Swiss-Prot record:
This is Aspartyl/glutamyl-tRNA(Asn/Gln) amidotransferase subunit C. Allows the formation of correctly charged Asn-tRNA(Asn) or Gln-tRNA(Gln) through the transamidation of misacylated Asp-tRNA(Asn) or Glu-tRNA(Gln) in organisms which lack either or both of asparaginyl-tRNA or glutaminyl-tRNA synthetases. The reaction takes place in the presence of glutamine and ATP through an activated phospho-Asp-tRNA(Asn) or phospho-Glu-tRNA(Gln). The keyword Nucleotide-binding applies. It is an enzyme of class 6 (ligase). It comes from Thermoanaerobacter pseudethanolicus (strain ATCC 33223 / 39E).
Length: 95
């Protein structure tokens, strides 16, 4: 399936890209080759292939959330240049 020059120009316009005439010609050839290559997938027999979302059948591997002891607050704030009421104090960025 060949991609036309006008299709490349249309996609470039949608993407707000400006190409020279030489670049449009080059992309027309390249995109046609890519589409032809991808169309080869239609030749595959997938009749007995089960649809998958992942190659490996892995499910949620996250650990359970558990509250664990943390570092001492004073130790954490020891090197903070600015602190207030046991918290880091940072410059205001939103009015």
């Amino acid at each position: 399936m060949a991609i036309s020059r006008s299709e490349v120009e249309h996609v470039a316009k949608l993407a707000r890209l400006k190409f020279s005439q030489e670049e449009i010609e080059e992309f027309t050839v390249q995109l046609s080759k890519i589409i032809d290559y991808v169309n080869k997938l239609n030749e595959l027999d997938t009749e007995n292939v089960e649809p998958t979302a992942h190659i490996v059948p892995i499910h949620n591997v996250f650990r359970e959330d558990e509250v664990k002891p943390s570092m001492d607050r004073d130790k954490i704030l020891m090197n903070a240049p600015y602190k207030e009421n046991g918290c880091f104090k940072v410059p205001k960025i939103i009015e």
